[in-house]
UniProtKB/Swiss-Prot annotation:
Function (record text): tRNA nucleotidyltransferase involved in the synthesis of the tRNA CCA terminus. Adds the terminal adenosine residue to tRNA.
InterPro entries referenced in this protein's UniProt entry, alphabetically: HD/PDEase_dom (IPR003607), HD_domain (IPR006674), HDIG_dom (IPR006675), NT_sf (IPR043519), PolA_pol_head_dom (IPR002646), PolyA_RNA-bd (IPR032828), tRNA_CCA-adding_enzyme (IPR050124)
Residues that, per the record, bind Mg(2+): 33, 35
This protein's name: A-adding tRNA nucleotidyltransferase
Coiled-coil features, chain-numbered ranges: none
Species, as recorded: Deinococcus radiodurans (strain ATCC 13939 / DSM 20539 / JCM 16871 / CCUG 27074 / LMG 4051 / NBRC 15346 / NCIMB 9279 / VKM B-1422 / R1)
Lineage: Bacteria, Thermotogati, Deinococcota, Deinococci, Deinococcales
Amino acid sequence: MFRRRPPLPPFPPGAALVGGAVRDWLRGVRSADYDWAHPDPAAGARALAALVGGAAFPLDEERGYWRVTAGEVQHDFVPLPPNLEDDLRRRDFTVNAIALREGRRLVDPLGGQQDLKRRVLRMVSEDNLRADPLRAWRAARFVTTLSFTLEPQTEQAVRQVAADLKAGRLPFPAWERVRDELHALLRSPDAARGILTLEALGLLDLTLPELREGQGLTQGGFHHLDVFEHGVEALHQLLTRRPDADLLLRWATLLHDVGKPRTFARDPDTGRRSFHGHDRVGAELTTQILTRLKLPGADVKRAAALVKAHMVQLPADDAQARRFVHRRRELLPDLLSLMLADREAARGPSSSELGRFAYMLAMERVLAALEEQPAAPPPLLSGKEVMALLGLTPGPRVGEVLRALAEARALGEVGTPQEARAFVQRWAEETPGS
């Protein structure tokens, strides 16, 4: 069922390999993170570092936590518990409650190997699940990333954890921890299925309630799905075409229409639905969501910018394509990937093969313009030169002139300092200052 088992790192004497690395090894997957339990973590870490040519250093000397780094591989050491089997019984799921001793001797008190073979995710106990409610999100993540089935009693227990979290009967995990589980899920090729799993388990309402607002909100026209389903399908379409898409693009694609429920209106005469300004409101909501999840400010800003720009009109000719690239260069090519995923996730009555073909042609114009000029050309005139030429003092007008000149250069309308000076003088005459 699984691939051939990869080679293991050398075992420091007395160590036990525990956790996900054992699970992955049994599945035939090479791990980049190894968790070790050792009677003397410092000695074990130093011994392994010498064997693999890595560096050993303490993470928390008082508690006996050590780490070894060797290239892209990381090894963490903790003290070996007095009773290894008892320690395994305190873990989250049976497939993670397996240890490996020297000589490839497995310690599996809960039948984790059998669950691995059956591709079933089973909790060790409901008490363990409730002891750390984050394990509910871990269940959704493992079901998604391992393509496992959630055992029925475990599914029921996860649903109960979600209900108790919502009712305040259990403490909510730190948002940073929730974010890390979401990111592990979103990195999966099956991320769209993972979002649906979160919804089925009652966890999406706790995590992304704004996204759920689109459930049942039909759109008509180009769309065959409701707003929520369309966002999930757009994520699926993105990963079909760009399996290497980074997390920010995945977030932006999932959330690109999150503003629609709050901008929904219906014409009383025609019954036609509209969502005017949903791109702007969606960008604001994206900022709120990703800030809540503690993403870095620069990442939040970029994801929100992608959401805000996803409705921009594609160019009708080559000149417009060059202008498109100049004005949105920092978002490319990700913006095009988002827009294409959006279009491919819409197969309503107004959608047609001819329309999709025309859309692709417009995208190809933009890609050609981006390939022709992958980076913005250096400025032909400085701000000081513009001020001297037009008799200006420092202020917004100088920025307006420089932006107009930069666009003219990107469009190929000017190419030399002499042409730039003539353009600036002409532009200033034709464009009165505010």
